[in-house]
Amino acid sequence: MPLGYAIPVPLFHYGAFQPLWQQPGLIQAGPAMGTPPNVEALVAALQQRGFDRRAVLLHYIDPFMLRSAPLRGLRQWHGPRLLACGDLHHGNSPIETLAAYLEAEPHDAVLLTFNPALVVEVRKRLRVPVRSLPPTFFRYPSAVPVERPLLQLLHVGSLGPHHPRRRELVAGLQTRGRLPFRHVSTSSPEEAAALYAQHALVLNVPLNHDLNHRFFEVMAAGVPQVVFGDPGLVGEHRALAERPDVFWASSLEELEELVLGLFAEPDWLRAISVPPPPYWELKDLLKAAFAP
């Protein structure tokens, strides 16, 4: 456990303030700091609020931001530095991008937020402890499933140019017409949670080796899901793949047969227990991340 872990922990990220991420001991920093982001400005802003730079810095980033607007000056942070990296399926050579950044801006440990399947590969490239402890510091909107959910397979997500696999699968389901199927796009996790709660089953199509937010969003909404992919996406977290509310399919035909079988027993499907996501308390997350 690093010195200073009990001091309130700044979470540096690039997005808007996220109320769901808040928990005791965490303060969000970064969205209003301007560009380019640097630790000197971060320290100055935090010291105005009485924070100590010996605290743990939780730095959330992805390969796109590492290339376009990386946080600089990490050596000026006097406490432990934990980098939480998401979206390691984005861009060209994302692992090399991460390794090059860490050579220039050292951190004491790395968390892969949604890429447990890539832990072994990333460890080979980095000199610091690397783990994946999903869903890290994230939290998701909860929902109460309706009493009589729609017997439709719901897919929520983008089908844009960066998502050809999803687009192909959705088009295949729509063209074949064997399943009652609905595809929608949403503008917020809260909107998605409300939709999940109205349906008996959700289709989750991860990208490459990314477990994705949707895996946990659906759990938080209390609805079973079918993941189109390999259970190896969970890495060493086998319990996630073996949950009673998570089903797996690796082909369009297998998906259709699985869903038709589940919809043939609607009472059994509705009775499936859906435990909440395995959320981490902040102190426990830091302890696990910094373990030798």
Predicted regions and their residues:
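C-terminal helix of von Willebrand factor
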Residues: 121-123, 257-262
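Short helix/strand-bridging catalytic loops that position acidic/His residues to coordinate divalent metals
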Residues: 241-245, 270-271
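A charged, aromatic-enriched C-terminal amphipathic alpha-helix characteristic of glycosyltransferases
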Residues: 256, 263-292
